[in-house]
Design a protein with these regions (language model features):
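Nucleotide-sugar donor-binding/catalytic module of glycosyltransferases
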Residues: 1-200
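C-terminal, non-catalytic tails of nucleotide-sugar-dependent glycosyltransferases
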Residues: 200-208
Length: 208
């Protein structure tokens, strides 16, 4: 697994040199999509995935996703099962995430059919394993010919990923442990605006 870390925090990671197998880029306060624009040409593997800084991706689970995609060229993306954990007073509480979608698949033969299937699915595809070609094409579409961003709202960026992934191909949730996510107060999981609000709110209407 090759790891790219485009870090937009104020201060660089002091121990980056201790990890020569990781490509580390310090880009303080740079917009998420602009960081992606820089790293897209660096992705040399056939598949790619996000791993948030409060997540623990499971290598064996990733291997199961890539094996599935190798065998199913009509699928663009796949992910497994998630577990959320919360440290509390010396103990750790665990609970499954997206339990209603343990076996979810989006298998329509056309992009329109797949988008209609996805309409009521609240489990995001953002952290799934996806084909690199699809990943690069979807994010190339986020920029105008002059290099400026078509939109800046990161809630919309996740919704854009969900739709674009299904335009490129089918999706599967596979029965493998894929990722552990720490529940942290103030994390994105607590501040993310629901899709239902994004689709109907005047605040987001123009970009949506």
């Amino acid at each position: 697994i090759k790891i790219l870390v485009p870090d937009s925090s104020d201060h660089p990671f002091a121990d980056a040199e201790k990890y020569p197998d990781i490509t580390y880029l310090h880009r303080p306060k740079l917009h998420f999509l602009l960081k992606l624009k820089e790293v897209l040409p660096m992705i040399s593997t056939p598949y790619v995935l996000y791993c948030a800084d409060d997540d623990f991706a499971v290598p064996s689970g990733i291997a199961q996703m890539t094996a599935f995609l190798d065998e199913h060229p009509d699928y663009s993306t796949a992910q497994g099962h998630y577990l959320t954990f919360t440290p509390r007073k010396g103990k750790i509480s665990f609970y499954p995430r997206y339990i209603r979608y343990f076996d979810k698949q989006v298998t329509g033969e056309t992009p329109r059919e797949r988008l209609l299937q996805e309409k009521n699915m609240y489990a995001s595809l953002l952290y799934s394993v996806i084909r690199t070609r699809a990943f690069q094409r979807m994010y190339a579409a986020c920029f105008n010919p002059d290099g400026s961003l078509r939109f800046r709202n990161l809630f919309l960026a996740e919704e854009f990923f969900n739709h674009a992934a299904l335009i490129f191909g089918k999706y599967a949730t596979l029965p493998y442990f894929y990722s552990a996510r720490e529940h942290i107060t103030g994390s994105a999981a607590e501040t993310t605006v629901p899709v239902s609000v994004i689709k109907t709110s005047h605040k987001y209407r123009e970009e949506y």
